[in-house]
Amino acid sequence: MQTGKAISIPSILKVGNGTLNKIGEYLKSEELTSVVIFMGNGLIDMFGDTIMKSLTDAGITVLEYSELDTVEIDDIITLAFDIPNKAKAVVSVGGGKVIDAGKYAAFLRNLPFISVPTSSSSDGFSSASASLLVHGKRTSVPAKLAHGIIVDTQVIRTAPEKFIYSGIGDMVSKITALYDWIFEEAHGAGVVNDFAVMVAKKAVNSFVRTPYESIKDELFLKELVDSLAMSGIANEIAGSSAPTSGSEHLISHELDKILEHPQLHGIQVGIATYIMSVVQNHRYVRVCTVLKRTGFFDYAATLGMRNQEFLDQIDMA
C-alpha cells in the first residue's frame, strides 16, 4: 500500500565557518572519490588552493577543474557529455551561474551534484531547477536537487553585502508566495501541499525571528542559508516552486524584461514582496520591519530604482 510521496533531500548539508576546508572529508564520507569541479570566474585564485588541498588530503581524484561562465543550454549539454565516465559527482563552487550550469550538467549525466555557493543571494543553490539561456531567453529547466550542499559562512560573510541583501529579499518573499498559493487553492486554481507549506513557513519564520546585531553575524548568516536551503526542500515536496515563488517573483521577471540594467533577483523580489504584502494585507508590518532593520531598504535606495517601475509591472505580472 502506498503511504506517501517519495522526495529527495540532500545527503550532505554542512553550513558553518570553515566548511570549505572539509569538502574532501564530506565527499569521502559519501564515497564520491572522483569528481569534476566547476568554479565561477576568478574563484580558482580565491579558493582553489583551499579546495584542492582538502580534496587531495581526503584522497579525492579531481578529473577536471575549470572556471565556467556560461548558462547557454547548448554549451552546458556539450559540457555534460564531456564529463569523464569515471566521475562520481559534479561539484560547482560559486554563484548562480556556475551552480545552475553544474546542476544541469549533473542532471543530464545522472550524477550527484554538490552545491558550494559562495554567496547567499537566493535559494537557487538548493533548488531542483536551473535558470538557463534557451535560444537567448532565460528559462527555468528541470534538474535535480543537490546531493550535497556545503556553505562556508566565512566565505558568505566576505562576499559583497549586496548578495546578503539579495538573499534577505528572496527569503522574505516566501511570505507573499505562500499567501498566493493558499489563495489560489481557495479559488479553485491549484492544490496546496500542506507539508510543503509547513516547511516553507518554518523556514521563513525561523529567519525573520533571528536575533542579530549585524547581517554579518554568524547566527544570522547561518539562519539565512539554512532557511534558503529549507525553501528548496519545500519546492521538492510540492513538486513546483509554488511555496517560494508567487506574484512578487512575477513582478521581478517582468522587470527583467524592461529594465536596461536589472538588479539582483533577490533585490527586485524583496521590494516586490513589500508591495504585494500591502496589496494582500498580509504580514506587511513584519516584511517592512525585516527589510528596514537589516538595511535592505537603505541599500535598495542607492540603486536608483523607481517605485513606478514596480507598480507598472503588477498588471503585467
Task: Give the residues covered by each predicted segment.
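Short glycine/serine/threonine-rich phosphate/pyrophosphate-binding segments
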Residues: 44-47, 97-103, 122-125, 244, ...
